[in-house]
């Protein structure tokens, strides 16, 4: 709609608001610059029917819409009769300003700082359009003066009352606190006049009634001149900002630029790359330690903001830059002991005057958190490693940055150690615990040689500094370092940090083959009872520790302990998910995108993975050594309850036995299944050959010792399987014969047989004089007897199920089984159902339902005989 279009009589307020929405910012500025002539003409003219004219005006096309003034002479007479009220742009802005002031006042009544912060920004934008030189509208001055007083009252109450604000109110209050003091400095003279006499200030309207002679154009001229001067100045450097404004960087303007950058943080359409370049320039010209610290803190935060915006990992360039800046920040803090960075420090609001040490003060406190930046740097490296293909050289190059990160973590620990020496600072223990926990997270899963290299490089980086928690002389060995870090967290932390420290130490001990100590710590911690109440990352660490303890037991030759420990993880079939080494494909459960995203974020980097193929191989091998003798034992003794050690292994074995043709083994699972089949048949040498041919054993330390241990285990379990299978066919069996068959020493054979006899697994006696095993007859059933009893049990179960089915169909009717003549006397003298209820012929006794009188017939009698 053209700005020359005239508003109607009856809808002055509606048309004015509609016009305001349709006007662009450029049109409004041009309208003010060109003067009020067109507004006066539009307000002076009038139509007899506003609705019809508005419609007609809206339909005019081309040059016709500019012919409104052609018949103005005919309407001069009607102007005297009908008065039209059309609001100017200035009046409309004043109305908007008044509504915003009212909204702020309402927010102050209910203490809603979130809405106050929003309306305060809106108020400043509106007041900027209404400024005449350095003078602002009086209602604006009143609003910001009252708001500053109210803010000071609220801050005073917060220091006295222990009740805290909610997060939204706290953020709003902090935002207003940061902006209002800087904003009110520009209007300090007017604010002082208002506070001196509020009534007189608001009643005096002479200043507002004086028209401003085209302030916009004057501002433009002055801006152009300033820009020209800046362009001519070649001594310093300048950056052109938005709208062609020239930004001057001087040591005095550092805090002003930082303030503007921090205020725009988190807003849309913010060029973070440009902000980082500005802060890098500010860092170059910073002179005082306070300026350098403030710039570095803001710069590191801005780099991390880039990582969160895209949802991906921080780029390598930005990560390395953040690492260097954080290292430089720690260096500056070390060189200037009177400057400290604390989370509890208050924000310094005066951008023109930096803080100085007052009498009785030892430190200049700067708000910030070194440990939070350190944790974020660690998390960004982890996210980067998650996104890189682990089988490329890029992953190795990226992993090399862990050394620099470990140095940062170590220096952060030393920094908080130094702060905690001064009790007056009241540094929370949690900050130091977080730094130590991060350090422990980077060493617990590594071999001792790698940890030693990391520690040596870290101590070289810090020079002559000393640590009270981890002294140099006590942390030379990796085991000592892990023990010192864990003991400190045991004594000075609670909850998650304490549990994670316990799990890290158990993992480290199991990784370095200290099985019995790691097992005892795991049992004494009782974490298995409370682990479900911890967070997901701690549960993942618990699963990893459990698996590592199981692998350690296997390396020690403790097959039963290893299988029992690995059962929970490997028996579930969800090893990838439980160990955070991959996302399982859900067939039936629909996983939301948010859950899948969180699951992927929790994945561990590849260098922390436990080899799942090796884990499966260990689990299946242990299950084979336990299940095959058990199957042989239960096969010859049906009275023994058939228990299952590993359902996963049993299913694999049954599937393998159902195959008609079995080819050569191709993978780990095939090797174990064919070894199981050979072991069950007594061919222990063949089983050993299959197990030794698995190539995954080479990934374990001391692979030859592992293979030797497995060969001995297979020999012993082969002996047990042979005795369980063929005991019913022997009266006596020489130990020397068994020794030759299984290539074991006679003493070992005697020990195995004695153990089986003592556990009542074998009905026999050991004649140590003649070195023979004497089997007792009548205790173990023969194969035929076992099959006969099995058939008897199945027949009895079939009869019982049939009679239960019949009872259900007849609905428990009495006399359901009392039928005469085989078919209930159908067609007899008593008609249909004759003889029902009478005695049976042939001398047969009545049989009760339920099959309780079944005796097994001839087969059962033969078995009983």
From Swiss-Prot:
This protein's UniProt keywords:
Cytoplasm, Initiation factor, Protein biosynthesis
Gene3D superfamilies of this UniProt entry? Winged helix-like DNA-binding domain superfamily/Winged helix DNA-binding domain (1.10.10.10)
Record field: compositional bias (Acidic residues)? 16-54, 69-80, 226-235
Q: Could you give a GO molecular-function term held by this entry? A: translation initiation factor binding
Q: Which residue ranges have biased composition labelled Gly residues? A: 822-841
Give me the Gene Ontology terms describing cellular component: eukaryotic 43S preinitiation complex; eukaryotic 48S preinitiation complex; eukaryotic translation initiation factor 3 complex, eIF3e; eukaryotic translation initiation factor 3 complex, eIF3m
- Where can this protein be found? Cytoplasm
Biased composition of type Basic and acidic residues is found at 82-92
What is stated as this protein's family in its record? Belongs to the eIF-3 subunit C family.
Can you name this protein?
Answer: Eukaryotic translation initiation factor 3 subunit C
Which gene specifies this protein's sequence?
NIP1
């Amino acid at each position: 709609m053209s700005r020359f279009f005239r508003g109607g009589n009856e809808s002055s307020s509606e048309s004015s608001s509609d016009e305001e929405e349709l006007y662009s910012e450029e049109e409004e500025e041009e309208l003010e610059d060109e003067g009020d002539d067109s507004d006066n003409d539009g307000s002076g003219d009038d139509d007899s029917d506003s609705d019809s004219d508005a419609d007609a005006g809206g339909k005019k096309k081309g040059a016709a819409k500019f012919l409104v003034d052609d018949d103005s002479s005919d309407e001069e007479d009607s102007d005297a009769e009908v008065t039209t009220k059309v609001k100017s742009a200035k009046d409309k802005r004043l109305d908007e300003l008044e509504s915003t002031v009212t909204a702020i006042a309402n927010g102050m009544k209910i203490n809603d700082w979130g809405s106050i912060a929003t309306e305060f920004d809106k108020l400043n934008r509106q007041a900027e359009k209404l400024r005449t030189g350095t003078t602002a509208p009086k209602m604006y001055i009143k609003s910001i003066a009252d708001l500053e007083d109210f803010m000071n009252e609220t801050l005073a109450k917060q220091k006295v009352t222990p009740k805290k604000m909610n997060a939204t109110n706290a953020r709003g209050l902090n935002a207003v606190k940061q902006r209002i003091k800087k904003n009110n400095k520009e209007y300090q003279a007017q604010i002082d006049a208002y506070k001196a006499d509020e009534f007189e200030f608001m009643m005096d309207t002479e200043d507002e009634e004086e028209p401003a002679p085209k302030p916009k154009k004057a501002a433009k001229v002055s801006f152009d001149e300033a820009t020209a001067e800046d362009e001519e100045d070649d001594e310093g450097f300048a950056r052109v900002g938005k709208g062609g404004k020239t930004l001057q960087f001087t040591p005095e303007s550092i805090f002003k630029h930082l303030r503007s950058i921090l205020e725009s943080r988190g807003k849309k359409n913010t060029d973070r790359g440009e902000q980082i370049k500005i802060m890098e320039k500010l860092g170059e010209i910073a002179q005082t330690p306070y300026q350098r610290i403030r710039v570095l803190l803001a710069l590191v935060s801005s780099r991390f903001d880039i990582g969160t915006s895209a949802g991906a990992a921080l780029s390598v360039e930005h990560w390395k830059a953040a690492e260097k800046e954080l290292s430089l920040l720690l260096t500056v803090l070390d060189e200037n002991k009177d400057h400290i960075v604390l989370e509890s420090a208050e924000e310094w609001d005066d951008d023109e005057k930096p803080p100085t040490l007052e009498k009785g003060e030892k430190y200049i406190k700067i708000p910030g958190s070194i440990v939070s930046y350190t944790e974020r740097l660690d998390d960004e490296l982890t996210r980067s490693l998650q996104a890189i293909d682990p089988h490329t050289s890029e992953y190795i190059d990226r992993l090399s940055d862990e050394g620099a990160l470990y140095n940062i973590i170590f220096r952060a620990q030393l920094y908080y150690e130094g702060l905690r020496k001064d009790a007056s600072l009241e540094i929370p223990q949690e900050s130091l615990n977080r730094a130590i926990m991060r350090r422990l997270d980077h060493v617990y899963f590594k071999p001792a040689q790698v940890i030693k290299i990391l520690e040596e490089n870290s101590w070289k980086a810090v020079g002559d500094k000393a640590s009270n928690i981890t002294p140099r002389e006590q942390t030379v060995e990796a085991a000592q370092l892990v023990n010192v870090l864990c003991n400190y967290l045991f004594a000075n932390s609670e909850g998650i940090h304490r549990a994670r420290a316990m799990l890290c130490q158990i993992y480290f001990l199991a990784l370095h083959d200290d099985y019995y100590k790691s097992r005892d710590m795991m049992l004494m911690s009782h974490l298995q009872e409370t682990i479900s109440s911890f967070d997901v990352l701690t549960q993942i660490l618990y699963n990893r520790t459990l698996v590592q303890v199981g692998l350690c037991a296997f390396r020690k030759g403790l097959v039963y302990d290893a299988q029992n420990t690995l059962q929970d993880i490997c028996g579930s079939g969800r090893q990838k998910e439980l160990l955070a080494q991959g996302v399982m494909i859900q067939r039936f459960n629909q996983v939301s995108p948010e859950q899948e995203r969180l699951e992927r974020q929790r994945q561990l980097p590849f260098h922390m993975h436990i080899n799942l193929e090796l884990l499966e191989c260990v689990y299946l091998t242990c299950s084979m050594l336990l299940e095959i003798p058990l199957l042989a034992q239960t096969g010859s003794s049906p009275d023994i309850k058939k228990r299952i050690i590993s359902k996963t292994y049993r299913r694999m074995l049954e599937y393998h036995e159902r195959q008609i043709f079995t080819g050569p083994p191709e993978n780990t699972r095939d090797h174990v299944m064919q070894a199981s089949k050979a072991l069950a048949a007594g061919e222990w040498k063949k089983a050993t050959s299959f197990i030794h041919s698995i190539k995954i054993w080479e990934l374990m330390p001391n692979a030859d010792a592992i293979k030797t241990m497995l060969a001995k285990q297979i020999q012993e379990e082969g002996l047990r399987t042979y005795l369980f299978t063929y005991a019913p066919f022997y009266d006596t069996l020489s130990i020397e014969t068994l020794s030759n068959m299984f290539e074991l020493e006679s003493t070992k054979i005697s020990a195995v047989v004695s153990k089986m006899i003592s556990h009542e697994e074998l009905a026999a006696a050991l004649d140590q004089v003649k070195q023979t095993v004497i089997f007792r007859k009548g205790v173990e059933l023969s194969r035929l007897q076992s099959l006969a009893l099995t058939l008897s049990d199945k027949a009895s179960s079939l009869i019982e199920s049939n009679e239960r089915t019949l009872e259900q169909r007849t609905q428990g009717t009495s006399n359901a089984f009392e039928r005469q003549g085989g078919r209930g006397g159908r067609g007899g003298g008593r008609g249909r159902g004759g003889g029902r209820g009478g005695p049976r012929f042939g001398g047969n006794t009545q049989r009760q339902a339920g099959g309780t009188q079944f005796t097994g017939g001839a087969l059962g009698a033969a078995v009983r005989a």
